C-alpha cells in the first residue's frame, strides 16, 4: 500500500521490527529556540526567576524527556540511551535562547526523536518557569541538525540553511 515504514500492507499502524538491523553507534543533534522579552532573558541569566534556576531545570527536563520519548510518541522504540546533552546559547541581540540537545547510543534504531524531544521539553520548561513574566514567549525552529549511524548514514541540516 505505501512506503511508510510504520504502516503494514493494509495501512494499519505498526512498530517497525528492528531486530535484523546491525548495532551501530548512533548520534543525533537537534536544535530549537525560544524568543522572549529582553527582561525575561535578563531574569533567566541573572538568576532572578522566582521558580529557581531556569536553565538547570530545563536541562534536567530535557534529559528526562529524551529518556521517556517512547512513552510520548507511540511508534518509537524504547531505547537504552548512553548519553544525552542539553545546552543553551543566549542570543541577546534577538532576545532568545538557542537550545541544542544531543542523544546517542549503540543500537539498532536512531535517536533523532529523543534529541528532538529533549529540545522541545527544555523549551517548554523555560516557558513554564517564566510565563508569569512573559506569556508571549515563542518556541520555534525545532529541527534535526544532524544524525550519524545506521543504514541511512549521515544527515546534516545545514544543507537546508539551518544553523
From Swiss-Prot:
Pathway: Cofactor biosynthesis; molybdopterin biosynthesis. Substrate binds at residues 75-77, 113-114. It comes from the Bacteria. It catalyses: (8S)-3',8-cyclo-7,8-dihydroguanosine 5'-triphosphate = cyclic pyranopterin phosphate + diphosphate. CDD domains: MoaC_PE. The keyword Lyase applies. Its EC number is 4.6.1.17. The active site is at residue 128. The keyword Repeat does not apply. Keywords: Lyase, Molybdenum cofactor biosynthesis. Homohexamer; trimer of dimers. Belongs to the MoaC family. Catalyzes the conversion of (8S)-3',8-cyclo-7,8-dihydroguanosine 5'-triphosphate to cyclic pyranopterin monophosphate (cPMP). This is Cyclic pyranopterin monophosphate synthase. It comes from Desulforapulum autotrophicum (strain ATCC 43914 / DSM 3382 / VKM B-1955 / HRM2) (Desulfobacterium autotrophicum).
Amino acid at each position: 500500500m505505501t512506503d511508510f515504514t510504520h504502516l503494514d500492507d493494509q495501512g494499519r499502524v505498526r512498530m517497525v521490527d528492528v531486530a535484523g538491523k546491525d548495532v551501530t553507534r548512533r548520534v543525533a543533534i537537534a536544535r530549537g529556540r525560544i524568543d522572549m522579552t529582553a527582561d525575561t532573558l535578563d531574569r533567566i541569566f541573572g538568576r532572578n526567576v522566582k521558580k529557581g534556576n531556569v536553565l538547570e531545570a530545563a536541562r534536567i527536563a530535557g534529559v528526562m524527556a529524551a529518556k521517556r520519548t517512547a512513552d510520548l510518541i507511540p511508534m518509537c522504540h524504547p531505547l537504552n540511551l548512553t548519553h544525552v546533552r542539553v545546552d543553551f546559547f543566549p542570543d541577546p541581540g534577538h532576545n532568545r535562547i538557542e537550545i541544542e540537545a544531543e542523544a546517542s547510543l549503540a543500537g539498532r534504531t536512531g535517536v533523532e526523536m529523543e534529541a528532538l524531544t529533549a529540545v522541545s521539553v527544555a523549551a517548554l520548561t523555560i516557558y513554564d518557569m517564566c510565563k508569569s513574566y512573559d506569556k508571549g514567549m515563542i518556541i520555534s525552529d525545532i529541527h534535526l541538525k544532524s544524525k550519524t549511524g545506521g543504514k541511512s548514514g549521515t544527515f546534516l541540516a545545514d544543507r537546508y540553511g539551518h544553523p
